[in-house]
Amino acid sequence: MRVGLFVPCYVDALYPEAGVATYKLLKHYGVDVDYPEKQTCCGQPMANAGFQNKSEKVIEAFDDLFRDYDYIVAPSASCAAYVKVYYPKILEGKHECVSSGKIMDIVEFLHDVLKVDHVPGKFPHAVSVHNSCHGVRELGLSSPSERNVQPFNKIIDLLNMVDGITIHEPERKDECCGFGGMFSIEEPAVSTRMGEDKIRRHMATGAEYVTGPDSSCLMHMAGIAKKEKMPIQFILSLIHI
């Protein structure tokens, strides 16, 4: 099984520790993981800004670069969901899309493919889990609150294996944090207020940290939570190797 590690552009530039933690944990579990150095942005920012047609070349290049891997794993539910859900629609009739059927968020890969039953290290602290919109509703990392289905949460399943951890979820646990990619740029006041409300609910749980698998949401909330001195940690950063 060969895995291609996809590190989104914003992770590479602003949140590199998430990419490093993902690579190290995959190696810990004996995965044959490779980082294709020619990878670029998945094209989501361009498409979300209304330039979907101009993103097609980027999308085709991404698809061609990763097509020979068995799985593509990313430390970002948002970017993974974009490749999975929107690539086939954008490339329909123009380019054979292979990557959409191989892309997975790191939690999804650990839970559904590797089916891990242990994690290394320990984290003796209380955490509040952030469920991202894309992770919940497009990747199925947890059950959406608006649907009458049997509750599940793959993020919490993974965290439950961490020695010493205490897990909480905030009120309105799967409500948007306000990031939304270009939304945070085009509607900064609304985005910030949504983020403040989200952080306030995380803090109300009594947790010492906020954690989750979607680096984009965590990056957004980290800027807002800084004045509250509320640490935000990528989920794999809690698992020391």
Predicted region positions:
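Iron-sulfur cluster-binding electron-transfer modules in prokaryotic oxidoreductases
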Residues: 1-239
